[in-house]
Amino acid sequence: MEIDPQLPIPLYFQLKTLLVEEILSGRYDLEKRLPTEHELCHRFEISRTPVTRALTELADEGVILRHRRRGSFVNPHWLSRRPDQPEIRAIVPAEGPWARMVRDAAGPGNQISVVEVPGHTLHHTLRHAVAEGQAPDVALLDNVWVPEFAAAGFIYALEELNEQWVHDEHEVDFLAPLVRVNRYDGKTFGVSPFADVAGLWYRRDALGALGLDPPLTWADLRLVGRAFADAGVPSPIVMPGGSRAHEATAYFLIAFLASNGVQVLGPEGVMLGSAATAQALRFLRSLVEDGLVPLDVVGYEWNQTVRLLAEGRAALSFGGSYEGEALADALGVPHPEVWDHFGFTHVPAGPRGAPASVAGGMMFAVFRQADQPGLAMRLLERVVEPEALARFARSSGRTPSRRSAIELVAPDAPFLSRTAELLETAASRPWLPSYPRVSAQLQAMLEAVLTGRLGPTAAAQRTADMIGAITGRPVVAEPEPVVVAAAAV
């Protein structure tokens, strides 16, 4: 088939149809890159506009996978399974050790197909796969999505697949905070391989050179930031500051709000429309106004802050404990040596709160559309075996989710005690099916305040109202201050 400009069919649709036919015919190797936009323009003698639209729609429909700086590839999960070859299909984020963990657990005797997607597209990819009836057998997802995916019936309760393993191993050996976040409506819907917390990274050498300690309060944070600014550090303090960083922004912001005693949701309803929220936002805006945080943070991607820290262009970086692996890679050192150069601590305390952190992490889940749910469950069990978790913890610096794995790693891992300490008192992200939309509102709130588009009080109240509408929960109003009349003389 060739493209005919004389036909009354749009060029992009002709190209899209042709590419689908070539994919189905086996023309393209699954491991090799598809032709680039430039190559397709040259081959069919058409402009770039229809080529771009054809590839974009194929990606949106899950036919192809697009990777930044690598190109486009056929999505092997879009193709029909072969009935003569039982295969486990998995989707994991491209960032991190996940694909290697799954392949190692599968072993050489099992057929497995692992698709890696950019982390910020993972939620959309999984929902789209379910909608198309092409969900994987196993996937790694943010554990805060458990309520959404479980309530929608997307994933199995693991008790349905191997209740004994859940009772004998998951509930006994896994860290209690992770057991809790993997549960919904009294059932377990996934297993976390590692524990993560939100906090503050700092450069030990930079603090030491100025004779400073890690900040314990917001006032300390400002003083330390000013000292680094005076010393010529280009961006003394950095943070994920907008929607381009996706969940990383909400993760940081929830921890920062907690440091001033603020919960997004409380037992009575939405708690954001408070003076404490406005105070936290006002402080963050003041850091931008004082030149201690660059306004560019509103456009940062999720991993940009840790890159600036590694390069010495920032001295303090709000983020997650999982970023230790990226720091090790940037420095070119084994992970244990990261702690010789960097420290990780709580978010400093605000005037109305205490030092804070937020628990997070990823979890493996089995989808109800799984072609091989039993095999998928056995794969999941092997992925989180103590020896496997210990091996990846040593290379990545992450904290294993199992006590038995921690015992194997502890002698070689100085990071474990610090992460475990933060985890003990960590707050949680809002636990409800509509969390992704709540997260988007939090990201928009911070971005609006940092850019000056909305004032702190207006942004807090607007976001509280939006989250109230999303969740159906009432917005809790702060009580009016009581004015005591002067006694008559």
Residue ranges of model-derived segments:
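Extreme N-terminal segment that seeds HTH/winged-HTH DNA-binding domains in transcriptional regulators
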Residues: M1-R43
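Conserved N-terminal structural module of periplasmic/extracytoplasmic solute-binding proteins
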Residues: R43, S47-W145, M466-V489
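Hinge/lid segment of periplasmic solute-binding proteins
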Residues: V144-V197
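Extracytoplasmic/periplasmic solute-binding protein
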Residues: F189, R222-V270
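Glycine-centered hinge/linker elements that transmit conformational signals in sensory
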Residues: G225, P267-V298
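Extracytoplasmic/periplasmic substrate-binding proteins
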Residues: R285-D371, A487-A488
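Mature extracytoplasmic/periplasmic domains
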Residues: D329-G332, M362-P436
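C-terminal capping/gating helix-and-loop segments adjacent to ligand/active sites or protein-protein/ligand interfaces
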Residues: S396, P414-T471
